[in-house]
Amino acid sequence: MTQQSILFIDRDGTLIDEPKTDFQIDSLEKLKFEPNVIPALLKLKNKYRFVMVSNQDGLGTSSFPQADFDKPHNAMMALFNSQGIEFDDVLICPHKPEDGCDCRKPQTKLLQKYIERELFDPATSFVIGDRATDVQLAENLGIRAIQYHPEKMNWDLIAEKLLGESVTNNGDRTPRYAEVARKTKETDIKVQVWLDETGVNDIKTGVGFFDHMLDQIATHGGFRMNVSCKGDLWIDEHHTVEDTALALGTALKQAIGDKRGIARFGFVLPMDECKAECTMDLSGRPFIKFKADFKRDKVGDFSTELTEHFFQSIAFTMLATLHLAVEGDNEHHKIESLFKVFGRTLRQCIRIEGNELPSSKGVL
């Protein structure tokens, strides 16, 4: 049987809203669809098969009677079907965490048929869900995850990533693409950058938090990239982070090309619980001013001191003038906001606005 591209999709908190009071959808009044989930699935259905995978704690017990579950669930399925959205399977684990079953996500027993018969293509199948257990399920299946978030990764963005839609009005220009391979005694790196399309980024450096940060650059930069790095992580992550930045900066510089028609300048000032600022000029003159105070040495498997070093390396290989600053209390969020704001600013700089070189000197 031919392997298929399958989306294994969580239900509560992903397809429909999950009540924060009791985390149960046990009445029609609680049934609320996530924004734009139906238009997104309609776009995706010609490319992917859908399988619903859900944990429903205590389903069929006095704490969550089957009849209370069935009414809103059947209404949800009927609405999906009426709009032309069909799920090949609806797989539900009724157990609680303390039951110790092997079918509760992130365990894979619910998907045993798909694993044993090799029904899904690992290269083109994904788990979509809002929880860390969904991400872990994807890892256990050997596929990639997209973690749903109503703002940061909503259904519009998910459809955009999975369909790889063109995001730049590039006219008759050749699509801006670059590929860089960099091999040293410490690292073996390959970077591919597509500046004029979005899609799922395939990023594997061996440093989980760093992978997540690189994905933020591409996602908020409005482009697609693949990054593969095999580094000397048995020593530490320094060479991996530094050399990846050098390779990525080189790839971005090559993909941008002669800079004719680009906006060149960018400025972003987002305000969350962290205040992150970024200004950028693709000037051809490398410079960085970085202001951040980290109170922890590590976030996950990533050394916080490498944050500045990453941006310094990428600025100098891109030949960009870069100013970055962040304030806040949560170290994870501070670093993440820097990568996001860098991506957002880069998005402005590489935007095509015409055909002129944005410099009075006639050269950049």
Swiss-Prot record:
Keyword field: Amino-acid biosynthesis, Cytoplasm, Histidine biosynthesis, Hydrolase, Lyase, Magnesium, Metal-binding, Multifunctional enzyme, Zinc
Pfam families assigned: Hydrolase_like, IGPD
Binding site for Mg(2+): 10, 12, 130
Pathway stated in the Swiss-Prot or TrEMBL entry: Amino-acid biosynthesis; L-histidine biosynthesis; L-histidine from 5-phospho-alpha-D-ribose 1-diphosphate: step 6/9; Amino-acid biosynthesis; L-histidine biosynthesis; L-histidine from 5-phospho-alpha-D-ribose 1-diphosphate: step 8/9
Sequence segments annotated as region (Histidinol-phosphatase): 1-175
Region feature (Imidazoleglycerol-phosphate dehydratase): 176-364
Name the UniProt record assigns to this protein: Histidine biosynthesis bifunctional protein HisB
Record organism: Actinobacillus succinogenes (strain ATCC 55618 / DSM 22257 / CCUG 43843 / 130Z)
Higher taxonomy: Bacteria, Pseudomonadati, Pseudomonadota, Gammaproteobacteria, Pasteurellales
